[in-house]
Design a protein with these regions (language model features):
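Core catalytic lobe of class I
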Residues: 1-242, 246-255, 259, 294-295
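Class I S-adenosyl-L-methionine-dependent methyltransferase module
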Residues: 133, 138-146, 267-295
């Protein structure tokens, strides 16, 4: 999204809070705060909604029909809506909007969970990432390196399971298209864990690079400790974080303020950037709206 369109959104008098929300994390109820975002302004939703699978007070499923109403209003028609999920919540999320559900990734984690039930159930070592959209969104396949090959010409086929196709040369210079199974280390591999369900920044960066362009606006409307906001910043995207910031405790002992934690992580990310990156972010106006980042 170019600066002209960003400035038009910021000057929309119907949504006076939007300017303070852009490139910040805002405390409040997710549905109510999403009502402060202009129509058709979000390029990508990347969010780790509460699954309703833990005993944490905050881990209750947000009414999905109300969420979809807001997503449909604020997300561009060709914007992707990408959700982490697991277990029963995966099914609930799929069935809440089957017409727009397209596919899912399986995220293989470096560390398993469910140890308390290890003698009764298998350990859980993956989560799902569900992708929804109305029209084909931005998609940048994150290629990986492999061995080059040339298998010659594949003959035409008229009875295939996936439709007819003409003869085609089957070869590769070594780059491989991504598959729907991803491996990323869990959040503790990146440093201190400050949220019970904290996601790794690296996972967020991969998905943001896949489904958005530099300068786009990424929304995480239940942003927790801010991993996906940090990922958006590192990839040169504008971002909006919303966090209710209630009933938060670390390991059921110490109360935590996720707004302050997120702001601190964002500021630390800025401090660790090199001069060229900072110059680029200022050039595209990404940092100009956050006073804390301009001190």
């Amino acid at each position: 999204m170019d600066n002209t369109k960003i400035n038009m959104l910021l000057n929309n008098r119907k949504y006076p809070l939007f300017k303070s929300m852009l490139n910040n994390v805002t405390q409040g109820d997710t549905i109510e705060m999403m009502k402060q975002i202009p129509n058709n302004s979000i390029d990508l939703v990347l969010v780790d909604l509460p699954y309703g699978t833990t005993q944490n007070k905050w881990d209750s499923v947000i009414p999905l029909p109300e969420l979809w109403d807001q997503y449909h209003r604020i997300v561009k028609e060709n914007g992707a809506m990408v959700f982490t999920a697991s277990g029963l919540f995966t099914a609930q999320l799929m069935l809440s909007n089957p017409n727009e559900y397209k596919y899912k990734y399986t995220w293989i984690k470096s560390k398993a969970t469910n140890f308390l039930n290890a003698k009764k159930q298998p350990l859980r070592k993956h989560e799902d990432i569900l992708v929804f959209y109305r029209k084909q969104p931005t998609y940048h396949p994150q290629m990986t390196e492999g061995e080059a090959y040339n298998k010659g010409i594949r003959k035409n086929q008229v009875t295939g399971s996936y439709g007819d196709f003409n003869p085609v040369m089957v070869q590769s210079k070594g780059m491989r298209y991504p598959v729907d199974v991803l491996y990323f280390k869990t959040a503790e591999a990146e440093g201190k864990v400050v949220h019970p369900t904290q996601k790794p920044v690296a996972l967020g960066r991969y998905l943001i690079k896949t489904f958005s362009n530099p300068g786009d606006i990424v929304l995480d409307n239940t942003s927790g400790s801010g991993s996906f906001l940090v990922a958006a910043l590192q990839e040169g995207r504008n971002f909006i974080g919303i966090e209710k910031n209630e009933d938060g405790t670390l390991f059921k002992k110490k109360p935590v303020d996720y707004i302050k934690i997120t702001e601190s992580r964002i500021e630390q990310t800025i401090r660790e950037m090199d001069a060229n990156t900072l110059m680029h972010l200022h050039k595209i106006n990404l940092l100009s709206n956050n006073e804390a980042l301009n001190d």
